[in-house]
Amino acid sequence: MTREQLYSGKAKTIYKTDDPDTLITEFRNSLTAFNGEKKGEMEKKGYYNAQISKKIFEMLEAEGIKTHFVEMLSDIDMLVKKVEIIKIEVIVRNIAAGSITKRYPIKEGTVFKTPVLVFDFKNDEYGDPMLNDDIALALGLATQEELATLRELALKINELLVPHLDKKGILLPDFKLEFGRRNGEIILADEISCDTCRFWDKKTGQSMDKDVFRFDKGDISKAYEEVARRIVPEIFE
């Protein structure tokens, strides 16, 4: 399969293929935090994130959630369906952590009675600001019906992920989702990995995600490897 680079993001590179209906996502070893202000590299990061995403996409597909995942072409190359990305990041919060504890009088570790769902404008230039429905509509990012669909899908994904990860000794304080339009439908895109989720060890509360790099909490490689061992143990056999 031929490939031509379409664009390169903070941690993934996207390629065109000879099939206009598919793209290749290459998961790189790049680490970034604070909108690219802090940078680093980690051996096998791309591998772990790609394999974690694959496994979670497959689980969600089995539960009726449509995703852009097609197949793995290599350890780090994922063949995906081409979608029109919706420029809205959908954040689902189950336990208070990160920015919400700085913006509001909520203590870190507070368990929300119901998930807190937030929309952010996917735009680095403006620092990914929070959106409400009116602003999203004014910017032409989505229709009212699409916003409702984003909420419905995100909450359904959360309902599936929380117990799935809990069985593996992982808490899911919050995570970011991205969606795209394809053939009149909205489907899950991007990735679900240590880069896009907060993963805490169920017993210790220890971070096992990009916060380890972001806030110098310890060995980032060990954190990502531990999550991979729990979610995709077969890659270590």
From Swiss-Prot:
Q: What Pfam families does the record point to? A: SAICAR_synt (PF01259)
Q: Which domain of life is it from?
A: Archaea
* UniProt GO BP: 'de novo' IMP biosynthetic process; cobalamin biosynthetic process
So what EC number does this one have? 6.3.2.6
- Where does the record locate the signal sequence feature? none
Catalysed reactions, semicolon-separated: 5-amino-1-(5-phospho-D-ribosyl)imidazole-4-carboxylate + L-aspartate + ATP = (2S)-2-[5-amino-1-(5-phospho-beta-D-ribosyl)imidazole-4-carboxamido]succinate + ADP + phosphate + 2 H(+)
Record's keyword terms, sorted: ATP-binding, Ligase, Nucleotide-binding, Purine biosynthesis
Gene Ontology MF terms in the entry: ATP binding; phosphoribosylaminoimidazolesuccinocarboxamide synthase activity
Q: In which pathway does it act?
A: Purine metabolism; IMP biosynthesis via de novo pathway; 5-amino-1-(5-phospho-D-ribosyl)imidazole-4-carboxamide from 5-amino-1-(5-phospho-D-ribosyl)imidazole-4-carboxylate: step 1/2
Similarity comment text for this entry: Belongs to the SAICAR synthetase family.
Task: Identify this protein by name.
Answer: Phosphoribosylaminoimidazole-succinocarboxamide synthase
Q: Which organism is it from?
A: Methanosarcina barkeri (strain Fusaro / DSM 804)
What lineage does UniProt assign to this protein's organism?
Archaea, Methanobacteriati, Methanobacteriota, Stenosarchaea group, Methanomicrobia
